[in-house]
């Protein structure tokens, strides 16, 4: 009888724990995805802060030329970064216990792998937690779907691209100037500016900014007057009020006359779906583009496409970009290569004797 009571007590304890984890009454919703999200994001954040401040230089290219990335080793907020794991490690899983010592682990850039893998797990669980909370509250699941765009983008630059290139050393450094360096080298090696999926991503980001500004300014300009001239217009809204706070008919009429009638939404629901979908689909395509270029399916090559009747090349913008690409490729990893791969011989010279 005692054993039965103990089992019931443990079931009740487990039941109370489950109820607490999945309760929507908590100030911050935890959820089952949160059980994994919280420790992974805390780990990634803690190691990032410590490494950004104090990590020793990392042999990123695997040629015994360490690169400094932390504040205590001469960097500032702009130049500092978590240097990617060494090319000598490649794609190997490199936890602390795989190294002979902590010094070796730091020298080979172990913190980068630790941060990136925990971060990707954490943001994926954050997306799952968004779906989970929506499910508990009886909401539709599109918040998590929208968040999948930045998750896909992060996964592309931190995981898919290194896999395609064969080494975590090709992943994006965790810093401001490191991000710019990654972008420049990516252009040099993959001609991303000439990739249609990147173009769709640019349209998504810039278009999303434009549509957000248009929507916000239209709504703000067509508020229903509830205040005097001496009060802020924001005081005319009360949280949870049933009536509309702006006149959508006026906004529709204004924009329809500014552009043309069918350029203006007359359905608030379809309008807000469009505002969400446009940037999300654009970033999806960019992430897909990074993931294909990871395996060297690169942007369009229109170099020397135009020639005159004598066969002489007439330079186009594509040729100007190509010259810039070659210059950027020559300059990056300058001690690891004698010349850029694009200029290498197609066949190795034969060796006699």
UniProtKB/Swiss-Prot annotation:
Residues found modified as N-acetylthreonine: 2
Enzyme superclass (EC): oxidoreductase
Effect in UniProt of substituting residue 264 to G: Herbicide resistance
Localization, UniProt: Plastid, Chloroplast thylakoid membrane
Membrane topology: Multi-pass membrane protein
Record-given protein name: Photosystem II protein D1
Molecular function (Gene Ontology), one example: oxidoreductase activity, acting on diphenols and related substances as donors, oxygen as acceptor
Residues under site feature: Stabilizes free radical intermediate: 190
Task of the protein: This is one of the two reaction center proteins of photosystem II.
InterPro entries, per database record: D1/D2, Photo_II_D1/D2_sf, Photo_RC_L/M, Photo_RC_L/M_CS, PSII_D1
Note: 2 of the reaction center chlorophylls (ChlD1 and ChlD2) are entirely coordinated by water.
Record's catalysed reaction(s): 2 a plastoquinone + 4 hnu + 2 H2O = 2 a plastoquinol + O2
Pfam families per UniProt: Photo_RC (PF00124)
CC per GO annotation: chloroplast thylakoid membrane; photosystem II
Residue sites binding a quinone per the record: 215, 264-265
Oxidoreductase recorded as keyword: yes
PROSITE patterns (UniProt xref): REACTION_CENTER
Binding site for chlorophyll a ChlzD1: 118
Transmembrane regions: 29-46, 118-133, 142-156, 197-218, 274-288
PTM section of the record: Tyr-161 forms a radical intermediate that is referred to as redox-active TyrZ, YZ or Y-Z. C-terminally processed by CTPA; processing is essential to allow assembly of the oxygen-evolving complex and thus photosynthetic growth.
């Amino acid at each position: 009888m005692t054993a039965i009571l103990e089992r019931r007590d443990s079931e009740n304890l487990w039941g109370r724990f489950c109820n607490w984890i999945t309760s929507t009454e908590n100030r911050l919703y935890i959820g089952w995805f949160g059980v994994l999200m919280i420790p992974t994001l805390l780990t990634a954040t803690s190691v990032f802060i410590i490494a950004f401040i104090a990590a020793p230089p990392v042999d990123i290219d695997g040629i015994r030329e360490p690169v400094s990335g932390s504040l205590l080793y001469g960097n500032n907020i702009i130049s500092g970064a978590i240097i990617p794991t060494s090319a000598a490690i490649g794609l190997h899983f490199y936890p602390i216990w795989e190294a002979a010592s902590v010094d070796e682990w730091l020298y080979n850039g172990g913190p980068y792998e630790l941060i990136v893998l925990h971060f990707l797990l954490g943001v994926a669980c954050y997306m799952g937690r968004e779906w989970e909370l929506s499910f508990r509250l009886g909401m539709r699941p599109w918040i998590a779907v929208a968040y999948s765009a930045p998750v896909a983008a992060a996964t592309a630059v931190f995981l898919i691209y290194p896999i395609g290139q064969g080494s975590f050393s090709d992943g994006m450094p965790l810093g401001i100037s490191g991000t710019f360096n990654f972008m420049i080298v990516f252009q040099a090696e993959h001609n991303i500016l000439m990739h249609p999926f990147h173009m769709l991503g640019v349209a998504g980001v810039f278009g999303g900014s434009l549509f957000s500004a248009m929507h916000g300014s239209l709504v703000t300009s067509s508020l229903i007057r509830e205040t005097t001239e001496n009060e802020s217009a924001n005081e005319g809204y009360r949280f949870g009020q049933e009536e509309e706070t702006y006149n959508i008919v006026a906004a529709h009429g204004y924009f329809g006359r500014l552009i043309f009638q069918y350029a203006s939404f007359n359905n608030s629901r379809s309008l807000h779906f469009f505002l969400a979908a446009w940037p999300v689909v654009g970033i999806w395509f960019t992430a897909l583009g990074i993931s294909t270029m990871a395996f060297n399916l690169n942007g369009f090559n229109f170099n020397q496409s135009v020639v005159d009747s004598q066969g002489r090349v007439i330079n186009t913008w594509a040729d100007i970009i190509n010259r810039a690409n070659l210059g950027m490729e020559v300059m990056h990893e300058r001690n690891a290569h004698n010349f850029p791969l694009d200029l290498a011989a197609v066949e190795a010279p034969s060796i006699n004797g």
